[in-house]
């Protein structure tokens, strides 16, 4: 069984990666509030091991409000109101998955535990400043994560919502993997084709056609 350490462990020794961590450390040391907390920056990889990945949902950078980000794209900690993009994901789920009921939270850990890699392409952000760490070099790291999944796994589902995710996933081998694209679930664009995309049921149909168990998208209320 290959682990993330086997596949991308050497990235940690690369100068660019050390430079990322140095910049994040300097930001925290200077008194800036950086999300998510240090122990949660790599949560997506801890919760969804390399060989366990079935579905990859690509986000952008972490939420930049207090207590929101915890290392999984689109997810927020329990007790925090689900942000608008996630509410649109829930809205689509109610239309797409029979019986889906919107939970009272936005904590997507149960998805991660079933093999949904919730991958932001930038893994840290300064409080209140969207995209503030976009130039740190995280994109190089997450490009290599996606490249490793593309090359060393097969029959994955990639959900690419919005132009940023679609650009990030442009090199995915569509002969080996299933790629679904739609506008971003943000309120600015959801009505242009995210709502009605049926990506959640399409994902499960593909997985079942490969003899894999479907994702249970329903989240129990907390």
Curated annotation (Swiss-Prot):
PROSITE patterns (alphabetical): U_DNA_GLYCOSYLASE
Uppermost EC category: hydrolase
GO molecular function, one term: uracil DNA N-glycosylase activity
Protein EC: 3.2.2.27
This protein's record includes keyword Oxidoreductase: no
Keyword presence, DNA damage: yes
Keywords assigned: Cytoplasm, DNA damage, DNA repair, Hydrolase
Catalytic residues in the record: 61
Gene Ontology CC terms, in alphabetical order: cytoplasm
Catalytic activity: Hydrolyzes single-stranded DNA or mismatched double-stranded DNA and polynucleotides, releasing free uracil
Top-level taxon: Bacteria
Subcellular location: Cytoplasm
An individual GO BP term: base-excision repair, AP site formation via deaminated base removal
Function recorded in the entry: Excises uracil residues from the DNA which can arise as a result of misincorporation of dUMP residues by DNA polymerase or due to deamination of cytosine.
Family label: Belongs to the uracil-DNA glycosylase (UDG) superfamily. UNG family.
HAMAP family: UDG
Matching NCBIfam families: PRK05254.1-1, PRK05254.1-2, PRK05254.1-4, PRK05254.1-5, ung
Protein name: Uracil-DNA glycosylase
Species of provenance: Pasteurella multocida (strain Pm70)
